[in-house]
């Protein structure tokens, strides 16, 4: 597995600088990868992989956490229309409890790459952990603010997960999933205390495991 020392200097790159430097190394099909939902008490962790055409412009695309829900949805549609390929993967609460959140996140990222209709020859990954694939790759801390491909993936992952959690609102009423998307806010914690965990709660997470009955 190859790694590149792309930025020996401290100069802050533009959102396409990582992609441009990787292309100059001879790679043509670069996938940005990010996840949404590592921290919540309920629901899956969702990962997205996005391959953008060379030179594409996506005004407004940045780290999904910095965008309003309305803007994220608008940019989701723009990315889906502009990208060369988009793949989405997920790991449910059961898998998270079984193998831990880090390994479940990497599994979701691996699945997202496998769902791409174009095989990538290089991966740019948000964070510090590499995906278990024999594809050249680089991890980038805060990559969703530094790479356009990763920023696009962060929006796809976030919107995809939010929509899934809104669907869970009707399947598991009483927890308020549409509002908090599974995060551990006061109202969600109160609902867990009153109703107990449901099927999509992460039963090894603090805030949930205290309410898991022994027979479960």
Swiss-Prot record:
This is Ribonuclease HII. Residues 28-216 form the RNase H type-2 domain. The gene is rnhB. Its cofactor is Mn(2+); Mg(2+). Endonuclease that specifically degrades the RNA of RNA-DNA hybrids. The lineage of its organism: Bacteria, Pseudomonadati, Thermodesulfobacteriota, Desulfuromonadia, Geobacterales. GO terms for cellular component: cytoplasm; ribonuclease H2 complex. GO terms for molecular function: manganese ion binding; RNA binding; RNA-DNA hybrid ribonuclease activity. It catalyses: Endonucleolytic cleavage to 5'-phosphomonoester. Pfam families: RNase_HII. A divalent metal cation binds at residues 34-35, 126. Keywords: Cytoplasm, Endonuclease, Hydrolase, Manganese, Metal-binding, Nuclease. PANTHER family: RIBONUCLEASE H2 SUBUNIT A, RIBONUCLEASE HII. Signal peptide: none annotated.
């Amino acid at each position: 597995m190859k790694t590149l020392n792309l930025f020996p200097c401290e100069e802050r790159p533009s959102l396409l600088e990582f992609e441009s430097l990787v292309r100059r190394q001879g790679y043509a099909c670069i996938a940005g990868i990010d996840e949404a939902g590592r921290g919540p008490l309920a629901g899956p962790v969702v990962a997205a992989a996005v391959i953008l055409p060379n030179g594409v412009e996506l005004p407004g695309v940045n780290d999904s956490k910095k965008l309003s829900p309305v803007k994220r949805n608008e940019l989701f549609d723009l990315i889906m229309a502009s990208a060369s390929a988009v793949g989405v993967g997920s790991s449910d609460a059961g898998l998270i409890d079984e193998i831990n959140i880090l390994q479940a996140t990497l599994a979701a990222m691996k699945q997202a790459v496998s769902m791409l209709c174009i095989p990538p020859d290089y991966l740019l990954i948000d964070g510090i952990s590499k995906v278990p694939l024999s594809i050249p790759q680089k991890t980038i801390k805060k990559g969703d603010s530094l790479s356009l491909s990763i920023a696009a993936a962060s929006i796809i992952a976030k919107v995809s997960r939010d929509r899934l959690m809104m669907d869970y609102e009707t399947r598991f009423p009483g927890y308020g999933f549409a509002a908090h998307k599974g995060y551990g806010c006061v109202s969600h914690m109160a609902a867990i205390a009153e109703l107990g965990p449901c099927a999509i709660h992460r039963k090894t997470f603090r805030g949930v495991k205290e309410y898991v009955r022994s027979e479960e």
